[in-house]
């Protein structure tokens, strides 16, 4: 899956899954726009990794929750690279995956739901609104949105987080239906628990062990495991796929 001369925008790319995705695209020859919010040093390290892997990259600080900031980021990418071929919406509101400390439904305020909606759907909305005029003009483009296997099997009911990710699936499929005739594809990748990441740092070892025992492939995903399916959905290998959700959880979703 070569991405030579392709330009890829990855949001939330300074660490974890986003960083792994950025590195993977660069290793296939892509130019990667490494979006981040606060950690400039981490973003710079990802840029260096991308260049060492054989691609090109630069970091752009932008809050995907701000339509103005996102528009400026997309305009900068187009000014510097002349094009955008792929968008990966990976950024989301900070969340702690701790089954023993999660809030029950009666303890979850609507504001908690709204915060996750704003992060998951709002961020993707802003990025898509900013990049779609360019995609329409070129009559091509691929959008990959990162969701969660919890939308299919909420083994732990993280009410606000999972509901927002489910909404992102609906958002993606509606876009896929509307944009397909224009040559623009929209798909989702749904990882299970990914370790190590900042979000999974709160997940206790005993729960991780129980998850491993329930997973047919008998381990937990690493950030690099998520990158491959993202590249597949962004590539010509998946040119006849849109509106799909690929589950990347070692088969756990079957149980």
Locations of regions flagged by a protein language model:
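Active-site helix of classical SDR
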Residues: 128, 164, 172
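Substrate-binding pocket helix/loop in short-chain dehydrogenase/reductase
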Residues: 97-117, 200, 211
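Short, small/polar-rich loop/turn modules that mediate ligand/substrate recognition or access, typified
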Residues: 180, 185, 241-243, 249
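Conserved glycine-rich cofactor-binding loop
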Residues: 7, 14-15
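Active-site loop-to-helix junction immediately N-terminal to the catalytic Tyr of the SDR YXXXK motif
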Residues: 100-101, 154-163, 174
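Conserved glycine-rich Rossmann-like NAD(P)H-binding loop of the short-chain dehydrogenase/reductase
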Residues: 28-45
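Catalytic Tyr-X3-Lys loop
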Residues: 85, 106-125, 140, 144, ...
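Alpha-helical segment proximal to the catalytic Tyr-Lys
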Residues: 133, 177-178, 239
């Amino acid at each position: 899956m070569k991405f030579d001369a392709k330009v890829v925008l990855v949001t939330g790319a300074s660490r974890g899954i986003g960083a792994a995705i950025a590195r993977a695209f660069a290793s296939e020859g892509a130019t990667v726009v490494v979006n981040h919010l606060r950690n400039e040093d981490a973003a710079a390290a990802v840029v260096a990794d991308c260049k060492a892997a054989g691609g090109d990259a630069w970091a752009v600080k932008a809050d995907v929750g701000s339509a103005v900031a996102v528009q400026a980021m997309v305009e900068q990418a187009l000014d510097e690279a002349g094009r955008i071929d792929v968008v990966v919406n990976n950024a989301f509101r900070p969340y702690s995956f701790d089954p023993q400390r999660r809030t029950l439904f009666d303890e979850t305020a609507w504001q908690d739901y709204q915060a996750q909606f704003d992060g998951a759907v709002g961020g993707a909305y802003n990025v898509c609104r900013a990049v779609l005029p360019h995609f329409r003009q070129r009559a091509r483009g691929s959008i990959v949105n990162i969701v969660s296997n919890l939308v299919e099997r909420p083994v732990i009911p993280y009410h606000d987080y999972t509901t927002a990710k489910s909404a992102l699936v609906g958002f993606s499929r509606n876009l896929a239906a509307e944009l397909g005739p224009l040559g623009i594809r929209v798909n989702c990748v749904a990882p299970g628990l990914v370790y190590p990441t900042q979000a999974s740092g709160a997940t206790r070892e005993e729960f991780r062990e129980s998850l491993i025992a329930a997973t047919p492939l008998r381990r937990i995903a690493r950030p690099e495991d998520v990158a491959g399916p993202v590249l597949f959905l962004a590539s010509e290998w998946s040119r006849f796929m849109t509106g799909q959700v690929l589950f990347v959880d070692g088969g756990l979703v079957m149980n």
